[in-house]
Amino acid sequence: MDLETRVSGHEKPKEEIRRIPDCQYAKTRSSPCEPLWGLEEAASRTSAGSWAHQDGLGDSSLFEIHGNQAITGSHQ
């Protein structure tokens, strides 16, 4: 949690961090938390893209994973 808080802490206020579950970070690693992402989180993937970029994943990686996994999770 230290790393995630440190990475996102200076980009988003603590309110945002609390509002969005920790699963958003695990999401980029294909965790089962992905289906928990609602429309609001999906809409904020633009912001998450910059987070993933700092994490070394890159915007394209996050968008690709988010699109495939999130859609599958929604149908389930």
Swiss-Prot record:
| Function as written in the Swiss-Prot or TrEMBL entry | Plays a role in viral replication.
Further remarks about this protein from its record? Product of an upstream open reading frame of the genome polyprotein gene.
Name of this chain's protein: uORF2 protein
Q: Which organism is it from?
A: Zika virus (isolate ZIKV/Human/Cambodia/FSS13025/2010) (ZIKV)
